[in-house]
């Protein structure tokens, strides 16, 4: 089974206090004046001070090889801040920095390295506060009130650039070609990297690098850049600068999963839950006009209306896509929730998943074999589990120390209120009945007889996403469930973490002295009627898993307090995020896909129609990243996920997988 942890950098600090890599026997930055060298080589070499004021797009994208200590990023961020202060009315409003790092520093080493540059402290402290765990793939950090986006890709750059989604092609405005010297790290400085840089560079993009090595210059020229030498910094004689003067036409791999956005920054979102709320915020951040249509009287009346929901990642013993997506989604969710300027009941108390029988123990053992960072997930024996959760369990398991619980109802309403302050238009008591394409717009028809017209539409209305002609074929299903609300007792109040078994039990919410226990599971059932049998079963599952635990007998469901909701799920347990696929056109165009992959056209979709749904039981974990992914896609901005995992979220994936194998789609 593949392991999902990245090896952190091993370094030491020399006599000058400069960090030195033990792996590459090279300094991370110059002993003389690393800060000034960065300004000269990368900011000056890319002429950023000249280009920022005349940039014709709201976003400027920089890509970098070798994040290291983050010196280049912090220096650029500082310069961008100065530019924004001096030019508040400029078209350029946001900075997007993409960087690759095979051996990321630990947070402690990062903080030590940053002590070198006190003038960068205001920016360095923000970076340290959000520094991600050593997990492979992309970590998106939203900084400076989301005016600066940092995508940290952990892994080998030559492998990662091959895994980038095609939507990133020809988007980069400037390249910082950095890293340890070619003589120290020859594996990085390859034709594969140079070709990837050219593929990602937009026409007119620039690059700069500290080296003047001939093979680097020739490799970049062969990739498509026009190169020239420039005087190097300080005692260095020369460095290299380049410009992408060609208009390359990159090959589109896997066109059946291609994603398209919109040039029109106006949309209608259908829904009223956490996904709709977070998507609204993500689009508003990018300058969109957003109108939210909700069938209910107020937000969070559907699956997002529970009093307490657990936050922890889904892991799988066999599905690589789940293991790539959910740990990244979880860490992004924690960063986003912590940064939101809103109040909602929550406690990051940890979540422990117990192995109460042989089958669950085997499942947990397989999850632990993923070798995730201990800060994300680690093993507990029976004694450690009882110490962690605070009650007798007599079995071990897996614990997620950064997990916990939150109130989805409060969070959803608070986020929509925040979005409303930022320009969101809300329309409640609007039940959408149909969507009709009219020229380049969508006409929305509501149960009341009212109509509305929008450039683009996002369906984020839970288990009702497949109620329309365009989405009816989507392979999703409803899952009804009931969560019981129980009063605390002295024994139950000892529970310190969210407890997961063949169900779940939350610690008490101190604001109402109640716990949540659940949840029943009824596939295909859309009923929201309270059921006495579900109430009884929620308690019985706890007793069955912990038959010797006296505290469990104090769970009292006789008050008949509960909440019934309906989730939307898929059989592969992954969300659906992206363009709404045209089912009939997909089957027609890809009828011979198994034999004609090389000549396949991009996936047939309904232009301007998107879906964000099928979040299942882990919506609190997946909704933040899914909203960010869709907002980036719709805005034609970099998407924070590799192409393979993105394909696993594509709404057409289940059909395309069969078509690729020459099987019939039913």
UniProtKB/Swiss-Prot annotation:
InterPro entries: FAD-dep_OxRdtase, FAD/NAD-bd_sf, MnmC-like_methylTransf, SAM-dependent_MTases_sf, tRNA_MAMT_biosynth_bifunc_MnmC, tRNA_MNMC2, tRNA_S-uridine_synth_MnmC_C. The keyword tRNA processing applies. It holds the Pfam family Methyltransf_30. It is found in: Cytoplasm. HAMAP family: MnmC. Catalyzes the last two steps in the biosynthesis of 5-methylaminomethyl-2-thiouridine (mnm(5)s(2)U) at the wobble position (U34) in tRNA. Catalyzes the FAD-dependent demodification of cmnm(5)s(2)U34 to nm(5)s(2)U34, followed by the transfer of a methyl group from S-adenosyl-L-methionine to nm(5)s(2)U34, to form mnm(5)s(2)U34. This is tRNA 5-methylaminomethyl-2-thiouridine biosynthesis bifunctional protein MnmC.
């Amino acid at each position: 089974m593949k392991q999902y942890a990245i090896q952190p950098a091993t370094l030491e600090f020399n006599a000058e206090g400069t960090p030195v890599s033990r792996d590459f026997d090279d300094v991370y930055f110059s002993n003389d004046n690393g800060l000034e060298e960065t300004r000269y080589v990368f900011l000056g070499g890319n002429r950023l001070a000249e280009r920022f004021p005349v940039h014709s797009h709201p976003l400027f994208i920089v890509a970098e090889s070798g994040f290291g200590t983050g010196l280049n990023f912090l220096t650029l961020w500082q310069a961008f801040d100065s530019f924004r202060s001096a030019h508040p009315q400029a078209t350029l409003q946001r900075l997007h920095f993409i960087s690759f790092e095979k051996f990321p520093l630990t947070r402690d080493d990062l903080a030590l390295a940053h002590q070198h540059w006190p003038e960068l402290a205001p920016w360095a402290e923000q970076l340290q506060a959000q520094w991600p765990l050593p997990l492979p793939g992309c970590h998106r950090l939203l900084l400076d009130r989301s005016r600066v986006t940092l995508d940290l890709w952990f892994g080998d750059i030559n492998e990662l650039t091959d895994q980038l989604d095609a939507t990133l092609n020809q988007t980069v405005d400037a390249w910082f070609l950095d890293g340890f010297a070619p003589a120290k790290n020859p594996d990085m400085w390859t034709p594969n990297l140079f070709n990837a840089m050219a593929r990602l560079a937009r026409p007119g993009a620039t690059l700069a690098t500290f080296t003047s090595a001939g093979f680097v210059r020739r490799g970049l020229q062969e990739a498509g850049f026009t190169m020239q030498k420039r005087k190097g910094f300080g005692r260095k004689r020369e460095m290299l600068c380049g410009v992408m003067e060609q208009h390359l036409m990159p090959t589109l791999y896997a066109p059946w999963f291609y994603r398209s956005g919109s040039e029109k920054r106006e949309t209608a979102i259908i829904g009223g839950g956490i996904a709709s709320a977070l998507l609204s915020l993500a689009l508003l951040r990018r300058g969109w006009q957003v109108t939210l249509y909700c069938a209910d009287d107020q937000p969070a009346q559907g699956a997002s209306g529970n009093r307490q929901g657990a936050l922890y990642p889904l892991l799988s013993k066999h599905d690589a896509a789940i293991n790539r997506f959910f740990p990244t989604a979880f860490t992004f969710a924690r960063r986003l929730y912590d940064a939101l300027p809103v109040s909602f009941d929550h406690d990051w108390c940890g979540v422990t998943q117990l192995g109460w029988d042989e089958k669950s123990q085997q499942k947990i053992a397989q999850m632990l074999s993923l070798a995730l960072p201990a800060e994300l997930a680690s093993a507990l024996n029976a004694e450690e589990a009882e110490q962690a959760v605070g009650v007798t369990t007599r079995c071990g398991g897996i614990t997620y120390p950064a997990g916990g619980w939150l109130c989805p109802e409060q969070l959803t309403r608070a986020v929509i209120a925040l979005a409303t302050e930022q320009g969101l238009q809300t329309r409640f008591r609007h039940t959408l009945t149909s969507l009709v394409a009219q020229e380049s717009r969508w006409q929305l028809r509501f149960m009341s007889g009212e109509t509305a017209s929008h450039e683009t539409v996002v369906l984020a209305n839970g288990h009702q996403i497949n109620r329309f002609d365009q989405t009816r074929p989507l392979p999703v299903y409803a899952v009804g469930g009931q969560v019981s609300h129980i009063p605390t007792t002295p024994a139950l109040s000892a529970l310190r973490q969210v407890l997961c078994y063949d169900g779940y039990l939350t610690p008490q919410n101190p604001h109402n002295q109640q716990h949540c226990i659940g949840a029943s599971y009824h596939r295909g059932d859309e009923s929201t009627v309270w059921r006495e049998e579900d109430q009884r079963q929620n308690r019985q599952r706890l007793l069955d898993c912990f038959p010797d635990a006296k505290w469990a007998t104090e769970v009292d469901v006789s008050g008949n307090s509960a909440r019934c909701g309906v989730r939307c799920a898929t059989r592969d347990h992954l969300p659906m995020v992206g363009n709404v696929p045209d089912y009939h056109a997909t089957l027609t165009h890809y009828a011979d896909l198994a034999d004609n992959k090389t000549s396949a056209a991009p996936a047939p979709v309904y232009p301007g129609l998107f879906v964000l749904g099928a979040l299942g039981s882990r919506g609190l974990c997946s909704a933040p990243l899914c909203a960010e992914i869709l907002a980036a896609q719709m805005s034609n901005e970099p998407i924070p996920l590799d192409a393979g995992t993105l394909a696993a979220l594509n709404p057409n994936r289940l059909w395309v997988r069969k078509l690729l194998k020459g099987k019939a789609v039913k």
